[in-house]
Each structure stands twice: as C-alpha cells, then as structure tokens.
From Swiss-Prot:
UniProt-listed GO biological process terms: translation
PANTHER family: 50S RIBOSOMAL PROTEIN L28, LARGE RIBOSOMAL SUBUNIT PROTEIN BL28A
Gene: rpmB
Entry keyword set: Ribonucleoprotein, Ribosomal protein
Name this protein carries in UniProt: Large ribosomal subunit protein bL28
Amino acid sequence: MSRKCEICGKGVVYGVQYSHSHRQSKRSFAPNIKRVKAIVNGTPKRVHVCTRCLRSGKVQRAI
C-alpha cells in the first residue's frame, strides 16, 4: 500500500525513538492514509488520501 497522500504529498518521515534510559533507535513515522473513492477530474477514482485532507474537505467523496 502506498504511504503517500496523492493530494498533499505527505509521506513517511524518519526519526529517532528514545527509551527512558535515552538509548536511541531509528524509526519511521507514517501518515494515516486511507483508500477512498473520490471525484478526480469529473470521474470517480480510488485514491490514497491522508485523513487531514479528508477532514479539511480537499477531497470530494464519490458515493
């Protein structure tokens, strides 16, 4: 499954996870991506969209 929003381009970000004793390990932060049916150029199409774009109304859902 794609880990990138097709509307805003938000994708995976890499960082560091710290334990209580401050030991470090690398980890990734993935966006909350949903596969929704949306209107794209007048036709319904399945797209990968982050929940921020869904909540803000940047995507017109197809029924």
